[in-house]
Design a protein with these regions (language model features):
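Bacterial N-terminal signal peptides that target proteins for export
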Residues: 2-16
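Bacterial N-terminal signal peptides
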Residues: 15-25
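Boundary at the C-terminal end of the N-terminal hydrophobic targeting segment
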Residues: 30-34
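Short, conserved catalytic-motif segment at the N-terminal edge
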Residues: 35-95, 115-117, 124, 177-178
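Short, surface-exposed loop or secondary-structure junction motifs
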Residues: 69, 74, 78-80, 134-343, ...
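Short, glycine/proline-biased beta-turn/loop segments that scaffold the active-site neighborhood
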Residues: 118-132, 223
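Catalytic cores of secreted or luminal carbohydrate-active enzymes
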Residues: 352-402
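Peripheral terminal and inter-domain segments
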Residues: 382-726
Length: 726
């Protein structure tokens, strides 16, 4: 019965969306064609130049569309600092998760062709897909596109490499086969990269074509998107904007999750996709999608799921982050938005179908999709003024806390305690010097660190710090307690709120087995040699800690941020259920016995104990790669020179005692200098192969630090490794 009610409600919503799309196409064209946007462009250019200067980014590019016109296209900064070359309209940027829009279009193309049904089980098309939770059979194609599959989140192992890794899709399938669902399929929408990676498997199974080939044939070619490509092979120098750390160019970034985040494109090319969507599926005389499919993409997919605090910031459509773009919704204008963030690139893609406007921006770090979306809000609001649809651009709201009101003991007690999300463990405590105030502390490898203090209840019902417009309140839903965050968003003219963290209650104290693992470290062994896991600042170390003051939890990860509940001596289980983004990217720790050692699987990455790493002795050392072909780690007790023989090894990396990369190479024989005691050598090679490492200690070299010191060092802060956020 519930299914039939949901189906009728969804059909009614899509029918309404279809009417809106068709009316927008008919009504908006004349106004868009007649408008002079000189004022919009003048203001937007000044804002873009200010954003470039404030962010310190090397470059970015944008496009503004009205109706069928590409009204404004401009680039800023330098695509190549070494040659002072500016980007041009054809310079490609990684667009991160904006790639999901292509995956959605590809899927809806198959729906229009009658090859795929959105609400059919995914296993109908990809029978090789499986998970440990039997409910995986309930996952539909739609759930892959609206983030409601219940998947843990993202397979980060081998996600970012220097060269394309064609085995990533199979690796995701293999990883899902040994994972559990975090929620019942369809129960709540939580941002999920792996769902879109599964679209690659869907396209391959249904069409016999690779995903990249299908998108090229069915989307890029019909739309004339000639400067859009997946990084399957190297790009010619000068065709893409380089990302930098300081003034040092980064290797070209390759995200192996093609459908979820791997595309390189330009704002000009993406503006063609935007015009197709604004036109209800047609562009340049070619119909790519039916109007019904475009309307389905733009319909709110979260209205029937568990979503106790709807947020315009995250109101998922099919592919879209929000089908009520908050900056436009604040002035009564409909909009769809998708953002993309990876390690090196950022993008924002906004379409206002009723107003017949669109804005696309792409850039390099340290920009963000949020800053580019905010720029887009500014441009589109000014464009609405130029159209006559708005009298004036809305003024930013005052950035100040509302007046204080007295909090009851119950209101204070509801806020206090421990809270968690996928990347945060938070403690809220009464302020020592004010019984009406609260302090926030975040758990780090160095213990509790204060993040906010003196928060008091205000007249809006939330706790704010003095001078802050951001406020916090509690709510109970689905049998769980949440801390909600309210804030002023985007261009500063609207308020929004979302569920931030979930209450953590005391659990059964940790067993002796888990207690023995606290404070220890493990090292990754099964990534591709050019994986970003092994690069500077990568999550090469896995550490385990507890939550001081709260029994029954371990915090796990490269930076000890995700709380887990051990359910037995070998499994640290995920448990968070926060709609939106708060429980995205969950992973479980599975302890596996390797001889006398405990190794840990975290997602698709396998870690070996750091404390039992073999040491290289002076003279010749034979290193043999095991039957699994895992990488081999060795410690260096003293400073000295290492010579790695020809044969056996294929790649090497040298790390200092704090796991910073000192060097890497793939040419042999290799001569490597370890400048101090306590360095680490990482070797890659074929299963069963052997190589010889000859160590010549430096004169007067001192012995390295012992294992206990190494474990202590593992708990110190390390460079942040930025994973693709959306």
């Amino acid at each position: 019965m519930r299914h039939h009610i949901a189906t009728r409600a969804r059909r009614a919503l899509v029918a309404l969306a279809l009417v809106i799309v068709l009316l927008a196409v008919m009504a908006g064209t004349a106004a868009a064609r007649a408008t002079d946007y000189a004022a919009t462009i003048k203001d937007g250019r000044a804002a873009a130049q200010a954003l470039l200067a404030q962010s310190g980014a090397a470059s970015f590019s944008l496009a503004f569309v009205s109706g069928e016109r590409l009204v404004w296209q401009e680039t800023f900064g330098e695509a190549d600092k070494a040659t002072s070359t500016p980007p041009d309209a054809d310079t490609m940027y990684g667009i991160g998760s904006v790639s999901k829009m292509l995956a959605t279009v590809a899927t809806m193309k198959l729906v229009d062709q009658g090859e795929v049904e959105l609400d059919a089980p995914f296993t109908r098309y990809v029978p090789a897909f499986s998970m440990l939770s039997p409910a995986y059979r309930q996952i539909t194609v739609r759930m892959m596109l609206d983030h409601s599959s219940g998947f843990p989140g993202s397979t980060y192992g081998d996600l970012v490499t220097d060269t394309y890794f064609p085995g990533y899709l199979q690796q995701v399938l293999d990883t899902l086969a040994m994972e559990r669902l975090k929620t019942t399929p369809g129960y709540m929408s939580v941002y999920c990269n792996d769902g879109f990676t599964m679209i690659e498997a869907l396209v391959l199974a249904v069409t016999g074509k690779s995903y990249a080939a299908f998108v090229q044939d069915e989307v890029f070619t019909p739309l004339g998107m000639e400067h859009s490509a997946y990084p399957l092979t190297p790009f010619p120098d000068g065709t893409y904007a380089k990302a930098y750390r300081g003034d040092v160019a980064r290797p070209r970034e390759v995200l192996n999750m093609l459908a979820s985040g791997g595309l390189y494109s330009t704002p000009s090319d993406m503006s063609r996709l935007a015009r197709m969507l604004m036109n209800g599926g047609a562009y340049g005389g070619t119909r790519l999608l039916s109007a019904a499919s475009v309307a389905e993409m733009g319909a709110d997919q979260t209205f029937l799921s568990f979503n106790p605090l709807p947020s315009n910031m995250l109101r998922y459509g099919l592919g879209w982050d929000s089908v009520t773009e908050p900056g436009l919704a604040a002035v009564g204008v409909g909009g769809w938005v998708k953002g993309g963030d990876s390690v090196d690139y950022h993008a924002s893609f906004t379409v206002a179908p009723q107003a017949r406007l669109a804005f696309v921006a792409t850039g390099v770090a340290p920009l963000s999709s949020t800053s580019l979306q905010t720029l887009g809000q500014r441009v589109l609001l000014h464009a609405l003024v130029d159209q006559g649809a708005l009298r004036r651009v809305p003024r930013p709201l005052p950035v100040a806390a509302p007046p204080v009101k007295r909090a009851s003991a119950a209101q204070l007690a509801a806020m206090e305690g421990y809270w968690g999300s996928f990347n945060t463990v938070l403690r809220v405590s009464a302020s020592a010097d004010d019984p009406q105030a609260l302090d926030f502390f975040q758990l780090t490898a160095n213990g509790w660190v204060p993040t906010a203090s003196g928060l008091r209840l205000r007249t809006d019902g939330r706790f704010h710090a003095d001078g802050s417009a951001s406020g916090y309140s509690t709510m109970t839903a689905g049998g769980r307690r949440y801390l909600a965050a309210g804030f002023i968003g985007g261009y500063g003219h609207y308020r929004d709120a979302l569920l931030w963290v979930q209450k953590l209650a005391p659990e059964t104290p940790l067993s002796a087995a888990w207690q023995s693992r606290l404070g220890k470290a493990w090292l990754a062994v099964n990534e591709q040699p050019d994986s970003a896991v092994y690069a500077e600042g990568g999550p090469v170390l896995l550490t385990l800690g507890d939550v001081p003051g709260l029994p029954g939890y371990v915090v796990s990860g490269p930076y000890e941020t995700q709380p887990l509940i051990p359910v037995d001596d070998t499994l640290g289980a995920m448990f968070l259920q926060i709609p939106g983004v708060g429980s995205r990217d969950l992973e479980e720790d599975l302890v596996e016995q390797h001889g006398s050692e405990e190794w840990i699987w975290r997602g698709s990455t396998l870690y070996r104990p750091q404390a039992t790493m073999p040491a290289l002795a002076a003279g010749a050392n034979t290193v043999t790669f095991g039957a699994e072909g895992y990488a081999e780690w060795r410690s260096l007790p003293a400073a000295g020179t290492l010579t790695i023989a020809v044969g056996g090894a294929t790649t090497w990396r040298l790390y200092d005692p704090d796991m910073a990369v000192l060097g890497a190479g793939a040419t042999f024989p290799a001569t490597v200098t370890a400048p101090q005691a306590g360095c680490y050598l990482l070797l890659f090679g074929p299963a069963g192969a052997s190589t010889t490492v000859t160590v010549a200690p430096a004169a007067g070299a001192q012995p390295g630090r012992d294992a206990a010191t190494a474990e202590k060092r593992a708990a110190t802060p390390r460079p942040t490794y930025v994973v693709p956020l959306r």
